Regions:
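Internal amphipathic alpha-helical segments of the cytochrome P450 catalytic fold
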Residues: 23, 54, 82, 93, ...
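Vicinal oxygen chelate
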Residues: 1-5, 8-17, 45-46, 60-84, 88-136, 140, 161-178, ...
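Active-site/binding-pocket entry motifs
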Residues: 53, 63, 181-182, 191
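Active-site-adjacent scaffolding segments
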Residues: 38-129
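Ligand-binding pocket scaffold of soluble enzyme catalytic domains
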Residues: 13, 22, 37, 60, ...
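Core segments of cupin and vicinal oxygen chelate
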Residues: 4-6, 10-52, 87, 95-103, ...
């Protein structure tokens, strides 16, 4: 049987007030190839890395909420997913919309108001490779964990699993797709910071978190949380010159 791929983070977008300046920043920091799309295309600027289309940059005034990074999850049927979002305590921000003959999307807010994309796309390449320059992890925090887990399981198609570290159950659920944990939702305060609504956090792979943090500063960005060690590597939380927050992590 074909591998069930619903529930994996399949697309990211950066909503920015200056696409060209943002392109220069991320091109230098992560080695991306960023090109303006042709007029009439659904994307404004295309981001490629290691031969794969991984993201787009869009104008800030097109953002469904605050500008910054947004993630979308693969679903089997976008209308069913949108209905599930309403049923599980969230709400639909953008109704299911066809983009091409094989692609449709909707935007929904989870019970805490964090906006997430729901994408039905027959041509999606599958989960992002686990390597430098790629988005390698995604998570969000919830004021009430169990309703949030239900929302992401039913609306975003996550095959959820309670995270266990050293035989201790954590206040955190992961989405396990193809045998690999690809994203998660945790209780507010899980990372030591009470921040709800938070917003979806995207982690990009780097070879050296400390060197990457220095480069962020040199390029006009901000280091929000200095590099630190955690269970799976070393990471740093940063913002680009326009304030879009993300994380850089070794792997």
């Amino acid at each position: 049987p074909a591998e069930r791929l619903a529930g994996f983070p399949c697309w990211i977008e950066l909503y920015t007030p200056d696409i060209d300046a943002s392109a220069a920043f991320y091109r230098d920091l992560l080695g991306w190839e960023i090109t303006r799309a042709e007029p009439g295309e659904p994307l404004t600027a295309e981001v490629h890395h290691d031969g794969r289309l991984i993201a787009s940059f869009e104008p800030a005034d097109a953002a469904p909420g605050d500008p910054g990074w947004q993630v979308s999850f693969m679903v089997d049927d976008v209308r069913t997913a949108a209905a599930a979002a309403e049923r599980t305590g969230g709400n639909v921000v953008v109704e299911p919309t066809g983009v091409t003959a094989t692609m449709a999307y909707a935007l929904a807010a989870d019970p805490d108001g964090n906006v997430v994309g729901l994408l039905e796309d027959e041509d999606c390449e599958g989960p992002y490779p686990y390597q430098a320059g790629m988005p390698v992890w995604f998570d969000v925090l919830a004021s009430d964990l169990e309703p949030a887990e239900r929302f992401y399981r039913e609306a975003a198609g996550w095959p959820t699993r309670r995270l266990t570290i050293a035989d201790q159950e954590q206040d955190f659920y992961t989405s396990v797709v193809g045998g690999r944990s690809v994203s998660g939702v945790g209780r507010a305060g899980y990372f030591g910071v009470e921040e709800v609504p938070s917003r979806w956090r995207i982690y990009f792979g780097v070879e050296d978190a400390d060197a990457a943090a220095r480069r962020v500063r040199e390029l006009g960005g901000t280091v929000i949380v200095e590099p630190f060690d955690f269970t799976f590597g070393r990471m740093v939380e940063v913002a680009d010159p326009h304030g879009a927050r993300f994380l850089l992590t070794t792997f």
